[in-house]
Amino acid sequence: MKHVNVLLAGGASRRFGEPKAFVKWKGRMLYECAKEALGEQTVIISRPEFIDRFQENGENEVYQDAEPFQGMGPLAGIYTAFKKTDGDLYTVLSCDTPLIQRRTMLELKRLMIAGADAVVPISDGQVQPLIAIYHKRIMPVLYDQLSEKRLRISDLLGRISVCYVQAENIGANPAEFININTRDDFSCLEEKSNSLKRD
């Protein structure tokens, strides 16, 4: 089966106040920290106004949401990755998760079993659908939901076969799953990162 790595970087960042993907932390942009957990061959899905900025930073495979679903959130991003690339299994990660470890993503990929449509971790009781593995066969379900403007990812998970994994069972640290929505979240990064051993 062919694997594709997908970084979702199309959020409006309203609560943060500026595009989170490009905010610098420890000398690197947040999206670069997240991308490190995926590997070099990564497709980025973003907003039209950010495409040039990613390309200027050396990113070659950057796409905007496929029509007619532009700006319709993470589901549109995942659908676009399916549509634009030739793969079977898609490792999906949000760009605002700078502490996620590569070993965690590899463990999730390893746990994709026959018949499952997705592998989704749970950390501290929170389901993490944007740090997950999806099979391309869910594309028709995604299309239907987007067409109906049902944009909640929890609705998608309710319609497909999901293998849920407790983060501690794959040796993942809860700190890995912090996602940066606000300035307060960003200010906690240093403290959270101190509890991690980087790969």
UniProtKB/Swiss-Prot annotation:
It catalyses: Mo-molybdopterin + GTP + H(+) = Mo-molybdopterin guanine dinucleotide + diphosphate. It is an enzyme of class 2 (transferase). Keywords: Cytoplasm, GTP-binding, Magnesium, Metal-binding, Molybdenum cofactor biosynthesis, Nucleotide-binding, Transferase. Disulfide bonds: none annotated. Its main location: cytoplasm. Mg(2+) binds at residue 96. Pfam families: NTP_transf_3. It comes from the Bacteria. SUPFAM superfamilies: Nucleotide-diphospho-sugar transferases (SSF53448). The N-terminal domain determines nucleotide recognition and specific binding, while the C-terminal domain determines the specific binding to the target protein. GO terms for cellular component: cytoplasm. It is found in: Cytoplasm. Gene3D superfamilies: Spore Coat Polysaccharide Biosynthesis Protein SpsA, Chain A. GO terms for molecular function: GTP binding; metal ion binding; molybdenum cofactor guanylyltransferase activity; nucleotidyltransferase activity. Its cofactor is Mg(2+). GO terms for biological process: Mo-molybdopterin cofactor biosynthetic process. The lineage of its organism: Bacteria, Bacillati, Bacillota, Bacilli, Bacillales. Its EC number is 2.7.7.77. This is Probable molybdenum cofactor guanylyltransferase. GTP binds at residues 8-10, 20, 65, 96.
